[in-house]
């Protein structure tokens, strides 16, 4: 299978977010890469589902709380940017203050 660098990056995001969701379900606090992967995956899937950019940003900013992450992680993530594929093409989605 020949994958482009972008496809490899997407697979890495989805793989890490899968692990992160499982750890979150077990009650573990998430580290920086795990938190970013969940926020990113939520935005990418929302776009794929046909939601608007605004709805994707809102949903991705509510997927995690400070209680879900290790101390200090929320402060390390002022925003998350991801190029997501919507029904009408690719758009850059910026999720501001994604962990509240």
From Swiss-Prot:
Superkingdom of source: Bacteria
Pathway: Nitrogen metabolism; urea degradation; CO(2) and NH(3) from urea (urease route): step 1/1
Record's catalysed reaction(s): urea + 2 H2O + H(+) = hydrogencarbonate + 2 NH4(+)
InterPro entries in UniProt: Urease_gamma, Urease_gamma/gamma-beta_su, Urease_gamma_sf, Urease_subunit
Name used for this protein in its record: Urease subunit gamma
Subunit comment: Heterotrimer of UreA (gamma), UreB (beta) and UreC (alpha) subunits. Three heterotrimers associate to form the active enzyme.
Function: Expression of the urease operon increases the likelihood of bacterial survival by contributing to acid resistance in vitro and in vivo in BALB/c mice. Y.enterocolitica enters the body via an oral path and must survive the acidic stomach before being able to colonize the intestinal mucosa.
Keyword terms, alphabetized: Cytoplasm, Hydrolase, Virulence
Any GO molecular function: urease activity
Cell location: Cytoplasm
Stated family: Belongs to the urease gamma subunit family.
């Amino acid at each position: 299978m020949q994958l482009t660098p972008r496809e490899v990056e997407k697979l890495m995001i989805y793989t890490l977010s899968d692990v992160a969701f499982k750890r979150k379900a077990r009650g573990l606090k998430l580290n920086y890469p795990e938190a970013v992967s969940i926020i990113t995956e939520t935005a990418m899937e929302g776009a794929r589902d046909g939601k608007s950019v605004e709805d994707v940003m809102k949903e991705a900013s509510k997927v995690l709380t400070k209680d879900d992450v290790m101390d200090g992680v929320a402060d390390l993530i002022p925003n998350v940017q991801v190029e997501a594929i919507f029904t009408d093409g690719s758009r850059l989605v910026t999720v501001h203050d994604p962990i509240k």
